[in-house]
Amino acid sequence: MNKKIVMAALLGMSVMAVNAANEADGDSLRMEQLQEVVVKGVWVQKNAPFAVANIKKDELQKFSKTGKELPFLFSQTPGVLAWGENGLGTGTSYLRIRGAGDSRINVTLDGVPLNSPEDQAVFWANMNSYSSLLGGVQIQRGVGTSTNGDGAFGGTVALSSKTPSEKAGGEVNFSYGSYNTFNVGGAFSTGLLWNHLIFDGAYHETNTDGYIHGTSGRSGSYYGGLTWIDDKFTIRYKNIGNFEKTGQAWNAVTAGNDDLSLMDGTYGSKTGIKTYKDLYDVGLGRYNSLYEHFTYDADGKFVRDANGNYQTERYVMNNGEPWDKTTDNFWQNHNILSAAWNINENWSTTASLHYTHGYGYYKEFRYDNKIKKLGLPSPEFNGDALGGAKRTDWVRKKGLKQDTYGLVWNINYKDNDWDVIGGLSVQQFDGNHFGYVTYLSNDALRTLLMKNGDYQYYDSDAKKFDGNVFIKALYHLTDNWDAFADIQYRHVNYKTDGYNDKFIYDEDAYLYKKHYLDINEKHNFFNPKAGFSFHNGGHRAFASLALSHREPERNNYTDNGNYPAPKAESLLDYEMGYSYATPKWRAGATLYYMNYDNQLVQTGAKSDIGEPLTANVKDSYRTGIELTAGYDITPWLTVEGNAALSINKIKDFDEFVEDWDDWKDNPDAAKYHCDGNGDELRQFHYDNSTLAFSPSAILNGFLNFHYKGWQAVWHTGYVSRQYLDNTENKDRSLPAYSTTNVNLNYTLPLKAIGVKEAIFGVNLSNIFNARYANSGWVYSAIAESYGHTNDNRYYQIGFVPSAGFTAMGSITLRF
């Protein structure tokens, strides 16, 4: 009923708006020019010496009808990977550029930082259908130009909001497809009122059952804007809200449980399970250990049916009802007040005040966990009062309340010789982390702990100040040569205190005890950049050198496990590129060498809520070549492609591995310390090993047919092998994969019935039904008493797969 009301309201507003409309283009030149002023501070200047990919408004609007998150559109550009937990591209999704994950990618909206200050990542599940609100995106690979917020260590994503239309109009859309996935939405603009004022709004929502069991969810966004515009000045208020309740699968698809791995070779077994496809073939392709567990027989062995498929069953609460699912619940509201002024033909300026409030929590069922892992304050909770019980089921609620506010300001000067931008950004973050146990299956423990209906087991506060100032200038040396220089100073102060959500194992007391956080870290970073560019006719060439620094993120302090305290990292990025374009064909190549000091690299491990964990390595690098090409075969048929070929290495790497046996009397064991669970650690050294999650080849090919109202796009992508840790071990890796998608659209004018046009679309994904995983995690250990030496470790892999063939149809009505 609520969805029907929303759609009716959107349709009504659109119809009222069209009654006032004129037959004219809705996006005026002056609005576009003023929007360029707003984003100028973070977008690469024309002819600046950096590698970029631009995504236009039309592509963004078409993509918005799929319900997928933005990373899946970005993955069509060179060197970019995307994946999502539920297998469909909706909800919890992730992004990598040149092998660097979300927390290393700077993201802004109209120059305002979007990265979570503590985690330094953008949570794309909280940005569902954002593409419908955008007028353009620029992806800068490498360090790129100076920006606001966290340092770019793989790339920068600069989002530009869609300019409000000066002509009244609107649209509504509906999409439906596989796994009961549907997207509804609409947008409207009042057009220009009283020659100066525009009110516009939008609402979009995506629902899905999810491919992976227990990942059904609902997420969406809403937008309301008020714009005052004059010929050279505009002031605009944007309120963008996001909501989500999405089923989680951060454990991914696993071969077994916490105690037993079904991966081939563990404990000497020959299961034949090495890849995600192998799991799919034994009935575990959609298995989610956050939602269900293996079925056991009377002897404690896994049950299989007549076809050899492993059987699973839902978790059950004390009242006999099945546990619904593990969910991520989050609400976020962005408020941005921006002003832009074209002062004269040389000078322009823009300023934005921003405030974001967010609140949310995970809710998760923990099956048969050790009671002492709750970090309880007294030994009595592990004694006779519990009837000797050592394990219990429990539900935890881990949450965050946060407020972020700040100012972004830019001043720009441009004449025939100079293009200069000065920028200032200050931002303050205040957050509170909390965790409650809301259910315990052990009656005695519930009576002792949950006197008020729940038990708070951690609480901590956090504050982070982030400020930067920069100036960048492009100087036209001649008609064909430009010089570029960019200097940025950035100051960061991060504080947190209180109890962590992780507990420390006390070997003497055989208990887990609370871990108190007391962090006060300050960083001062100087980030210079310089380069040259050449342009003549269709030829363009550039070379640049850029330095960037980045502070550790929150989980580097709270989840660093076996590794020493985290350090800030730095990156020296060398880039060189050439491109040539004619009216019919175009081609380009970019060479890069990214040299890291103390890079925080992914270890293949994850936190207990699915965050990828990282650790410092002293010397590492990423180097490669990125190729693009396109040819217009006819006016209605185009072939395009891009390729990213790379080498990603750690020069010297020390790995710490759990040893389940007692190594106290073994002189050959290079012990480091205990891991917090009472297991000893062994240290192994590697030279020139491949960085985790860094495929050596990412390829994309497109065939685009467009004739009158018809459009069809064929897209085939290929990703080479990815190692899940930094040891370059093939057993702990994801095989290469290739997928093909087809998108079809037809635009039908319907002005005779009061509709500007109707757009019908069909999106066909993975048409050859490939069974593959595009991300994952790994755990490995040594247990020589069970035959698991370092060369033959016990290991468990969590595979993050994509669904097989899926389809979605859509219809959009524009007024």
Predicted feature locations:
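C-terminal beta-signal and adjacent terminal beta-strands/loops
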Residues: 639, 720-724, 746-815
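Extracytoplasmic beta-strand/coil segments of soluble accessory domains associated
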Residues: 71-113
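Short loop/turn motifs that connect adjacent beta-strands in outer-membrane beta-barrel proteins
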Residues: 28, 164-169, 193-196, 232-234, ...
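Short acidic/polar hinge/loop motifs at secondary-structure boundaries
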Residues: 113-141, 160
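Structural signature of Gram-negative outer-membrane beta-barrels, strongest in the C-terminal barrel
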Residues: 419, 425-427, 452-596, 632-634, ...
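Short, acidic, small-residue-rich periplasmic hinge/interaction motif at the N-terminus
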Residues: 20-62, 102, 586
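Gram-negative outer-membrane beta-barrel transporters
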Residues: 476-480, 593-595, 615-727, 812-814
